[in-house]
Amino acid sequence: MTNIRKTHPLMKIVNNSFIDLPAPSNISSWWNFGSLLGMCLILQILTGLFLAMHYTSDTMTAFSSVTHICRDVNYGWLIRYMHANGASMFFICLFLHVGRGLYYGSYMFMETWNIGVLLLFAVMATAFMGYVLPWGQMSFWGATVITNLLSAIPYIGTDLVEWIWGGFSVDKATLTRFFAFHFILPFIVAALAGVHLLFLHETGSNNPSGLSSDSDKIPFHPYYTIKDILGALILILALSSLVLFSPDLLGDPDNYIPANPLNTPPHIKPEWYFLFAYAILRSIPNKLGGVLALVFSILVLMLMPLLHTSKQRSMMFRPISQCLFWLLVADLLTLTWIGGQPVEYPFVIIGQLASILYFTLILILMPIASLVENHLLKW
């Protein structure tokens, strides 16, 4: 008799994805982040569902309803802070997952990579709209500033912004629709993640060497299920520590002040995970130019397969490219720092230089370094 997991139509899908899946024997802990992201998404959907049971998307009561969740709902404070800090963990895993893809050349699986970039956009949109919901000062002004960027689009810009707002300013209509979108988008993300996995399983996983691993596969279970559980425990430990010891560490104190359209906060800034893109946006004096740079800073990831000039897939044996990769990481950390600073000297010029370096590294220096390494191979 054949095992039910190999014959049952539903169990067969699970079996081929998580149990009998042939996986390379040498993938490192950098390959843990896919499962961690899945875990983060499930956590966010569950905590979000329980928050939505108590939240009201009305400008008069939104702030009070969040306060009510934290004060009066059983373990409401825990659910709220797990959701808020869970988003931070989600983005940490996302950035590490993308970084892994860049380092080891995983972007050569083009369908998987491009759907991954779409996933990144979708998660960023979800996080932005979620940040608006508590209706604090930073929620309101963040929504105003970011949606206003669309007015830079020629001809239709102003109409588009007013259409998104549902009026002539960020108000009740905006909050209600943002809540609706914030609820539906995670399910779209989950569907996209399914397609992401579908395309990944067409080709099989990449591995640190960047070479074909067809001749040396091992079953996903038990080897990588155990390995993923270790990653999951570390993630849970980190999230629990953050939530229980310092839940407001990554938040903005201004968001504990109810939204007031008549009072602008001294420094409007998004959550930490958007600061690098915000710094790129601010470093260009022209509004439309800034918006284009902002979008292109993420969209440039889609060009990675076209910019790959090396004869080797992975950076494992390419020291010049490795140096440039870590320079890119340092540059992104610099941009993140600058995004949280006021618009004054010397931060403006540092931000502009870091933005130029970001695009120069990706579009010019890394492809040239790969060509140089190809040439060095001949010696």
UniProtKB/Swiss-Prot annotation:
Superkingdom in the source lineage: Eukaryota
GO BP annotations listed: mitochondrial electron transport, ubiquinol to cytochrome c
Amino-acid positions noted as binding a ubiquinone in the UniProt annotation, renumbered to this chain: 201
Keywords associated with the record: Electron transport, Heme, Iron, Membrane, Metal-binding, Mitochondrion, Mitochondrion inner membrane, Respiratory chain, Transmembrane, Transmembrane helix, Transport, Ubiquinone
GO cellular component entries: mitochondrial inner membrane; respiratory chain complex III
Family of this protein: Belongs to the cytochrome b family.
The protein's assembly and partners: The cytochrome bc1 complex contains 11 subunits: 3 respiratory subunits (MT-CYB, CYC1 and UQCRFS1), 2 core proteins (UQCRC1 and UQCRC2) and 6 low-molecular weight proteins (UQCRH/QCR6, UQCRB/QCR7, UQCRQ/QCR8, UQCR10/QCR9, UQCR11/QCR10 and a cleavage product of UQCRFS1). This cytochrome bc1 complex then forms a dimer.
Protein name: Cytochrome b
